[in-house]
Curated annotation (Swiss-Prot):
InterPro entries recorded: PSI_PsaA/B, PSI_PsaA/B_CS, PSI_PsaA/B_sf, PSI_PsaB
Lineage, opening ranks: Eukaryota, Viridiplantae, Streptophyta, Embryophyta, Tracheophyta
Domain of life assignment: Eukaryota
A Pfam family the protein falls into: PsaA_PsaB
Protein topology in the membrane: Multi-pass membrane protein
Organism: Oenothera elata subsp. hookeri
Gene name tied to this protein: psaB
Name of this chain's protein: Photosystem I P700 chlorophyll a apoprotein A2
Cysteine pairs bridged by disulfides in the record: none
Amino acid sequence: MALRFPRFSQGLAQDPTTRRIWFGIATAHDFESHDDITEERLYQNIFASHFGQLAIIFLWTSGNLFHVAWQGNFEAWVQDPLHVRPIAHAIWDPHFGQPAVEAFTRGGALGPVNIAYSGVYQWWYTIGLRTNEDLYTGALFLLFLSAISLIAGWLHLQPKWKPSVSWFKNAESRLNHHLSGLFGVSSLAWTGHLVHVAIPGSRGESVRWNNFLDVLPHPEGLGPLFTGQWNLYAQNPDSSSHLFGTSQGSGTAILTLLGGFHPQTQSLWLTDMAHHHLAIAFLFLIAGHMYRTNFGIGHSIKDLLEAHTPPGGRLGRGHKGLYDTINNSIHFQLGLALASLGVITSLVAQHMYSLPAYAFIAQDFTTQAALYTHHQYIAGFIMTGAFAHGAIFFIRDYNPEQNEDNVLARMLDHKEAIISHLSWASLFLGFHTLGLYVHNDVMLAFGTPEKQILIEPIFAQWIQSAHGKTSYGFDVLLSSTNSPAFNAGRSIWLPGWLNAINENSNSLFLTIGPGDFLVHHAIALGLHTTTLILVKGALDARGSKLMPDKKDFGYSFPCDGPGRGGTCDISAWDAFYLAVFWMLNTIGWVTFYWHWKHITLWQGNVSQFNESSTYLMGWLRDYLWLNSSQLINGYNPFGMNSLSVWAWMFLFGHLVWATGFMFLISWRGYWQELIETLAWAHERTPLANLIRWRDKPVALSIVQARLVGLAHFSVGYIFTYAAFLIASTSGKFG
């Protein structure tokens, strides 16, 4: 018999039902479970797939550059970034009638095009790209890197080039190389690019391959570096009247500490950012020499962890045994990496709008909204993934003997206390926040808005004041003109910071009130509940009160019958599954809050948010309903407009989302009967019954149906909100 899919599992390949296909797809990337897998092959497969991942990323980014160069309007946009709409790529659609062609022909294009809301134009402009030729060059370079990555992935699977397991488990060397090489050297290289190409570009001087050896980035050259007069590099910065991309009002400084924003572009000063990257490079180059390898300098991580025994013995054996536990568990390492990456991605969302790094991006409101929402959603998925792999670690890799009485074992020992505290915090936040919202709703419904319970966020306002925001009148630290910090700030460090924080034209430290207080606690409820479900799922992965022996059942078991009191919904997978709904729910509140507050800020009617956000009906009516009006007007006598595609996507997103419930709220027997009936009808229908299949059709398993339902729910939810966000923002601000 010919080899059938999946080749990696002979047991599955011989399954006579359609289960073979679905289980094959589900376990394709679970290398650990494949036939004949060895530890060595496992590490090598993962290593090779990393190169494949890099190849895909480089190909994708190359495509972005290529399509903008080919079909975009980058050169026109560079001439007038605030009024020309950046084009992502052309739309080729033979079904377009004349009204559609007219609706989507914009940005100075000759035919229908898509507008770019990704911020790439602003990014490329800031780092010194100016012409389509520059974009093509970049696209070709990335294509080359993509090919190199593919070759490297293939090469490291060949017998002669296969790394050994000991190479993969050499944690010190890997950390040193990643810290110094990946972060240190690349940050230094980026500083070099900013100083040699981007900063001259922002001052109207084009530096390319043909002249970069002739153009001095600073009039003093390397002199100040070698004579220790580093302050010369900070003297004569760009003035506040500097026109970005021209020499008008420009200075000669390359590494500054100005603080605040460039008045024209509303983005951070390029010279501040170069300085920042140089500092990061310096720190990481040192950090990359921290761990002991064959050079005999630095620390051994194992020694560090073994020595880390808490004083007084109240926390057991501290970190003993952790080195081998982490170093031998890919899931533990992946969990740590995902947790870090998730937090960083969320921080990127927060900082991209409050401290915009790219020229003119702060005035492109739709792009700001899209980037914030995009990064928050990505962060949510990555963070839930961290806990999923933490749970798999406990099931597959955790060895109680190796970790006796250390911090990991003690987490498991008092997991009831951890889970109950999280549960209490979630209940407290939920009931109090909902209670306030509902009370306020009732007061408005009865026509007595003055009876609302409105709480000023005084602690948060005090923190904002301490950082220099004067409007609350707290007169403390940086907002007090008498404090030494305030006076030092005027001259020594970041003189532009205090101006920026008190200007109302940016998103730094927005003024907050009772509406913010309430939604902040709603978001806190979502975060704590999501965390509760994820933490409980991981800590109970090996066993819980009801089912003390989950280890051999694995990560994703469905129900183990009524024998143990009914074991439905208690696998680690079920916890992950439930947590994703809460994660999406929480990010919904986060993005609604961000978007509504910013829409009112940009439109200059902040009072709408302040007055309507204190009760639920306000959110439903003045944010969701009011802003979706353009998406739900259906067909009208005016024909098509450029928001029509978003209206369609809004509808389609709802459809996909609702389809999720078909899989989430139904029992397996129902599907099996439906399938049997359809198969019966097929076999008895002339012509149709000429088509036969080898596998007996069976319904999805409980876990699979939940996964399919969750996927539709998530994708539909995100599609719906993406269409709403982009249409409601671009419809108002063009």
